[in-house]
Amino acid sequence: MDSVVFESVRKVFRHRPALFNWLGRERGGETIALKDVSFSAARAEVLALLGPNGSGKTTTLKLISTMLLPDAGTLRVGGFDTRRDAGQVRRQVGIAIASERSFFPRLSARENLDFFAALDEVSRRERRQRIAEVLAGTGLEEHADTLVMKFSSGMYQRLGIARALVKRPNVLLLDEPTRSMDAATTAHFWTTIRALARQQTAVLLATHNFAEAAAVADRLLVLHRGELLADRPLREGESADALRAFYFRMTGEIDEALVRV
């Protein structure tokens, strides 16, 4: 069974221009964030969602996590419909959240992770093992006993990833996970993600980074202005330059953020 299945999923954001809000009028517009998107993600597979800002990558992840719900179409995670069975879906999904408000500032990184691991009602021994693994996998071992209130924004990002990993999810959602990591930590993190996928986890990675997609992904989804333009496997040894050229052929343009990586 596929872990994630999109069938003609559409997401629309309705809004009113500031002028009409100020005037108290109802006139406004809408933005179609996803346009009838269909794809699936299997267990033990890493999917890279590649596209510029506004392409629909983050919306896709939020729909899988049930932070948003589809306006049309069907989305199933682990066989559960995200509209009807949101609670069942959330039990299976881990999503990396880097916000300071997601953690207890006066607890250490280790203590925060222990709290979230305990929500799964696992033994203390199992929690210790999980926490040691995710601290190593995200390069936070040296900061395990540092109060979270002292963390930099980059460390918060890594702690958000660690929180998602400690849950041992069936589906892991990552949004630009390595943007604040140095090269060594990034390489180690990619190894961690590949190992996690081999444990039957479906990983969906939203990224601007061609090198990241080439290093870690099994399949590539190209999103552009809410449309899914391509869904194909990566060839063994396919380079970042090859992915960049493919993206250009599919979209006819390259976003500046994508050119730089």
List each language-model region with its residue ranges:
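A short, surface-exposed alpha-helical micro-motif characterized by mixed small hydrophobic
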Residues: 213-215
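Conserved ABC ATPase "signature" region
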Residues: 114, 118, 125-143
